[in-house]
């Protein structure tokens, strides 16, 4: 009986995702990946560099523990808290 209970406990632990982590799109590959433990916020950061006029804004996608704050003017950061919510921006 103890063996059966132990087996059920092990199967339950293996089947349940006890350490759920957020999934976000990550650059440069723009693919969905699990975020490291403790990072439950997805973000999209956009900014202009020297090629902004011809190529458009640069984009950085990733995970964070809290929503990052821009360190310079001209950097836009959008945060969200659902799986894969930080899709690559669609430009007009």
Swiss-Prot record:
Q: Which cysteines are joined by disulfide bonds?
A: 24-42, 35-63, 48-52, 67-79, 80-85
Which UniProt keywords are listed?
Acetylcholine receptor inhibiting toxin, Disulfide bond, Ion channel impairing toxin, Neurotoxin, Postsynaptic neurotoxin, Secreted, Signal, Toxin
The cellular location(s) given in this protein's UniProt record come to: Secreted
Which parts of the chain are coiled coil? none
Q: Thylakoid: is it a keyword of this entry?
A: no
- Alphabetical list of CDD domains matching this protein: TFP_snake_toxin
Name one molecular function that GO assigns to this entry. ion channel regulator activity
Question: Does the keyword Metal-binding feature in the UniProt annotation?
Answer: no
Its job: Binds with high affinity to muscular (alpha-1/CHRNA1) and neuronal (alpha-7/CHRNA7) nicotinic acetylcholine receptor (nAChR) and inhibits acetylcholine from binding to the receptor, thereby impairing neuromuscular and neuronal transmission.
Q: Which family does it belong to?
A: Belongs to the three-finger toxin family. Long-chain subfamily. Type II alpha-neurotoxin sub-subfamily.
Q: What is this protein called?
A: Long neurotoxin 3FTx-Oxy1
Query: In which organism is this protein found?
Result: Oxyuranus microlepidotus
